[in-house]
Amino acid sequence: GRHWLDVVRFGESSGELTVNDDKPRSNAWRFRDAVIRALNEDVPFDQFVRFHFVPDKKNKELGQFIHLGTRLQDNANPNDKQFHRLDDMVATTGVAFLGISFGCARCHDHPVDPMSTEEYYQLTAMFWDQVKETPKAKRKTIPLEINEPRVLGKGSWRSPKQTVQPGFFKVLN
C-alpha cells in the first residue's frame, strides 16, 4: 500500500513547511486503511481505480483521494486556494492514473504536452464541484472572483477567459 500512497501523494498531515503549522489530518487514516484493505483483498485494479472517483459503500473512503492534495493556510486568498486545489487534483490524477504530467498546460499550450490549455481547464471543470472554498480570511471576507469553470490566462484567476464544460483531452479519445 505504501507505494500507491506515494503515487497519490498521501500524507497524514497538512504538509506545512514549519513544524508549528504542520497539522494532522484527522481522517486521513481512513483513506490509508482503505487502500491497504483493498490491496489485501486483491480488488482488481480497474475497480480500485474506479472506487477512487466513484466509491461504493464498502470502499467509500477511497473517494477521499481527490481531497488529499495541498491545503493552503486558512488566511490564504480563497481564489488562490480554489485553483491550487483544482490544479493539484488534475496533476495527481494525471500522474497517478495516466502517467502524464500536465504542468505546462495550466498556463500555456506546449509543443510536447499531450493536452492543450483549454483541455486542461475542461479537466479542472470535472472537479469543479469538489472544491468548495469559503471566501474568508482573518478579519475580512474575500469574495470568490470566478464562480464557474473557465480557462485562465497564464494560469491566473486574475485573467479569466472563456467558460469551459467538463471534458477530457483529445489524445486519449
Kindly label every feature range from the protein language model.
Residues 1-153, 159, 163-173:
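Short, structured secondary-structure elements
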